[in-house]
Amino acid sequence: MLLGTGFEETEAIAPLDLLRRAGISVQTVGLNGSVIYGGHGIGVNADIEIGEMDLTALEMIILPGGLGGVASIRAYESAMNAVRFAWDNGKFVAAICAGPTVLADLGITAGKNATCYPGCEDGMGNAIIIPDSACIRDGNLITGTSAGCAVPFGLMLVEALKDKETADRIAQQIVIR
């Protein structure tokens, strides 16, 4: 999970929590150092910094939104290269809120069903925007709309990496209504 200064905290922490509840090993990757501050001033200790990332072990790369976080990802060539590597090697690529616009910059969303934060549609390139969807999976591409959709987005990531039964079990444990 790529974390750049100004990331949207809910869009990072909720999916991270759900993935770890599922027993999935997730590393948070700091782009601007080892402690990254989100858009609302919450500091997160990244597990590793971008230069330590092992792309060969990657199963999925996750981009939370937040305009500052998305700008940080775009500013780091190594982060953009990691996203491109994941996609080119058949790994899952997931992004929420403004994050999918980074994927569009790389041509990943072209011809794919996707969603994004309302108002970011112009930055989605040739994606097939599915309005009013919390999150969408199209093959190895997973996109989510906003912080308000962070839990369904996280459960979709669990389902992609594990299975529906695990995602359903976790949804039940956290009492999704």
Residue ranges of each PLM-predicted region?
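Short, solvent-exposed amphipathic alpha-helices that sit
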Residues: 14-21
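Membrane-interfacial amphipathic helices and adjacent loop/beta segments
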Residues: 29, 34-40
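Glycine-rich, flexible N-terminal cofactor/catalytic loop recognition
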Residues: 11
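Active-site-adjacent pocket-lining segments in enzyme domains
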Residues: 1-3, 7, 21-31, 48-49, ...
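Short gly/ser/thr-rich secondary-structure transition/capping motifs
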Residues: 40-49
